[in-house]
């Protein structure tokens, strides 16, 4: 089989992977605090016993775009926005600690505070609030609850959000969408981040996604055209091979 088919096939496969990343970004254009996943294509020379005349392509995801999203005023007491390098600690499905910029906190029927289904971690573990209580969040992350029918002066703290600080280069996104410390960062900062008492949150405000929907749509169209071009290359090479076989059979 002509080597050009392998080259075009590899390019088409990686273009599909790149399009999947773009589609994921586009799907999260309205997710609070979402950080767009970066993607790129790079050339990979084919090495072997023969001359290095071929170059394949592979897709790579160098990380996330840490550009802050726009702040949206919601007036919802359980919505919080963080400073640029601040993160909220949450518990992932395997019980490990992860971090998110999504400040849309929800209250489960059990009173558990969650973000996108992940329990919110406080300085003493996962946070739960009394059923039906009115919840407020202070600038330092302290969560207070007022039980139904109680006077306003009986507001009591029930926990404090674990606010941590990390730069974009220190964390990486997992398959569940939650960020964790990279292996290099764990070597210097430990397996989990410690709470930073200097961080502050803004209650009633949400940071929006930093995905540019128009640019993402343009990338989707460009990826589709690249894929179509690679398919035409494969078809052309196959046609040429068929015609060559016909000529050989005639001789």
Stretches found by the model and what they are:
Residues 1-251:
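Amphipathic alpha-helical polymerization modules
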């Amino acid at each position: 089989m002509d080597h050009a088919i392998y080259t075009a096939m590899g390019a088409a496969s990686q273009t599909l992977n790149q399009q999947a990343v773009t589609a994921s970004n586009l799907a999260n254009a309205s997710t609070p605090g979402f950080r767009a996943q970066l993607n790129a294509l790079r050339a990979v020379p084919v090495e072997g016993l023969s001359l290095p005349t071929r170059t394949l392509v592979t897709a790579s995801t160098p990380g996330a775009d840490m550009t802050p999203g726009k702040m949206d005023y919601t007036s919802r007491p359980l919505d919080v926005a963080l400073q640029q390098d601040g993160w909220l600690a949450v518990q992932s499905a395997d019980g490990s600690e992860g971090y998110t910029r999504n400040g849309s906190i929800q209250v489960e029927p059990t009173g558990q505070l969650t973000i996108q289904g992940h329990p919110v971690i406080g300085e003493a573990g996962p946070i739960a609030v009394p059923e039906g209580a009115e919840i407020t969040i202070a600038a330092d992350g302290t969560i207070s609850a007022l039980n139904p029918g109680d006077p306003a002066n009986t507001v009591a703290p029930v926990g404090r959000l674990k606010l941590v600080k990390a730069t974009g280069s220190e964390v990486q996104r997992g398959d569940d969408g939650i960020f964790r410390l990279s292996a290099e960062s764990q070597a210097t900062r430990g397996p989990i981040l410690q709470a930073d008492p200097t961080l502050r949150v803004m209650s009633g405000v949400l940071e929006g996604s930093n995905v540019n929907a128009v640019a993402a749509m343009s990338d989707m169209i460009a990826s589709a055209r690249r894929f179509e071009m690679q398919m035409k290359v494969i078809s052309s090479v196959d046609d040429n091979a068929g015609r060559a076989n016909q000529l050989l059979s005639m001789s």
